[in-house]
Amino acid sequence: MKSFCDNDDNNHSNTTNLLGFSLSSNMMKMGGRGGREAIYSSSTSSAATSSSSVPPQLVVGDNTSNFGVCYGSNPNGGIYSHMSVMPLRSDGSLCLMEALNRSSHSNHHQDSSPKVEDFFGTHHNNTSHKEAMDLSLDSLFYNTTHEPNTTTNFQEFFSFPQTRNHEEETRNYGNDPSLTHGGSFNVGVYGEFQQSLSLSMSPGSQSSCITGSHHHQQNQNQNHQSQNHQQISEALVETSVGFETTTMAAAKKKRGQEDVVVVGQKQIVHRKSIDTFGQRTSQYRGVTRHRWTGRYEAHLWDNSFKKEGHSRKGRQVYLGGYDMEEKAARAYDLAALKYWGPSTHTNFSAENYQKEIEDMKNMTRQEYVAHLRRKSSGFSRGASIYRGVTRHHQHGRWQARIGRVAGNKDLYLGTFGTQEEAAEAYDVAAIKFRGTNAVTNFDITRYDVDRIMSSNTLLSGELARRNNNSIVVRNTEDQTALNAVVEGGSNKEVSTPERLLSFPAIFALPQVNQKMFGSNMGGNMSPWTSNPNAELKTVALTLPQMPVFAAWADS
């Protein structure tokens, strides 16, 4: 068998790396001189230290071999403590391989350990167990399974370069306190906890390599070690599980994934609940839930509309906001029946809308959409039933606004006392900026579209209405007097129409007679006024319309 102690310095370094023990400087000098003398030292680690190390089992070799080197309380074999001495032959070579080649039977007792005479070749059969002292290597046992290639497998383990690299890596892992318990064990790639063979040889130590350990003490140490090994194994399993859980949680947080449940290597991602706040879906067709207000809105897609400059055909028609989902669904049904007829798909049966179908026959699509909006329970931007109208949060008055007209910003139209006035202001602005296709709160036939489009300013609701040519007189008495003037001079012609009065009149003048100016009024009257009542009539009929301030400012 090849000796592990060669004269080459490289072999010395490899041997120390393989077996995991260190040689002092004096020892290396002795090896360099070619000497075969060795000074041994006992291990400074106590039994408590060795029992605190982690031991499960490290099986070395291929799958066909049952050979194993164990550190623990396995009755079949194992290493129970660090070797405090290296057995040498008479020529100075290691005899570890020769000791490992020996095999024992399955019923071999723990007290039949190798003796000193076995290593020095002076063993006698009549030597008593009490007289012979156990070597500190007495805890080295052999596997009960006898295989002819045991020596070869073990020798390949110490000579295989990948195994040496693995041993070096495990020693590096042993320095990490987070992976080891007290720094006394390492985690191997085989899934087992293994302990490297750490042997120390010090030149200053004496040759007291023989210890007087007895069988009773060995049994106690074995029981104590097995209990510690079981506790440490359970703690390591919990630590590894916690480490995996923390790693998975950190990975999920980094990727921003939802909570997952691991079931047999499969990840099941939970979907969001249907009742969660903020969703925009509904069980009814054409109904969405507003993510901010929580109110339900009804929309209809009009695919018959084609806007210039847009490749997509159609537009979304807003039908109003509702506090209940069923109301929004019914609004969609009515609009769909108006647009597409009774053959369209509705949320509820068309038989429930017989009365509404008769009413919508006299309205256009835009008129009926405006009718549905006015019946809604409120828009998303305020509590008004009219489009573009909101209520001021401080003084409670109604404000009118229109969006996406002045540089894609909201245009403030003013503050009004009633919702209707604010709604009219919105309608006028919508017609002014969007033409005849504008969606208005009231029927578009209510307004003079040509006049609104030709005006340079936004007209008020009164001026924007159709048939608004009469003078508004707020005083009832003045209105009665004006009617009397018109009726009194309706059958008389004006002799000199070129001399009509053209001064602006704010109010109508009452009928003039002689009683108003006295008895001498008729004689002193100017000759060019033959019929003052007729002239007053002409004045009243030819009064120019007073200019009305069309723009309104914020109050």
Curated annotation (Swiss-Prot):
Biological function: Transcription activator that recognizes and binds to the DNA consensus sequence 5'-CAC[AG]N[AT]TNCCNANG-3'. Required for the initiation and growth of ovules integumenta, and for the development of female gametophyte. Plays a critical role in the development of gynoecium marginal tissues (e.g. stigma, style and septa), and in the fusion of carpels and of medial ridges leading to ovule primordia. Also involved in organs initiation and development, including floral organs.
Result of altering residue 322 to F: Loss of activation of transcription
Effect caused by changing residue 389 to A: Loss of activation of transcription
Single GO MF annotation: DNA-binding transcription factor activity
Effect listed in the UniProt record for changing residue 287 to A: Loss of activation of transcription
Effect of residue 358 to G: Loss of activation of transcription
Record-given protein name: AP2-like ethylene-responsive transcription factor ANT
An annotated GO cellular component: nucleus
Keyword Translocase: no
Effect of residue 452 to T: Loss of activation of transcription
Effect of residue 380 to P: Reduced DNA-binding and reduced activation of transcription
